[in-house]
């Protein structure tokens, strides 16, 4: 096993750990989930570049008769990238004392100001950071409003 294979295993393990945390552990942290809302995905250009580069590496490894283990590891990395970038849906998860946004826990008392833009983006101003929440379904903004009113 080469150092390349070890690095690939490390990246696959990191992506798998992130996917498991995002899918199974985060919704169970900090109490029961009151509301979980699907968000719009960010630009997919980065994901296309990542999966494309891994596909080029797979092609290069196959045509140069590289190690079969490396080809399988690259394929697993491409599948993990495909899952994380295209299948997994970003979510905002509301709990009793706060919410998870982009895998970061934010307590309700940190919200200083909230605005709704004309194009349906909820803007939350924290102490030093601004959150831009783009929901997939515009009707979910009313659900978010009700949760925030009930818990503040």
Swiss-Prot record:
Its main location: membrane. The chain crosses the membrane at residues 6-26, 45-65, 67-87. Belongs to the UPF0266 family. InterPro entries: DUF986. It holds the Pfam family DUF986. This is UPF0266 membrane protein YobD. It comes from Salmonella newport (strain SL254). It comes from the Bacteria. It is found in: Cell inner membrane. GO terms for cellular component: plasma membrane. It is a multi-pass membrane protein. Keywords: Cell inner membrane, Cell membrane, Membrane, Transmembrane, Transmembrane helix.
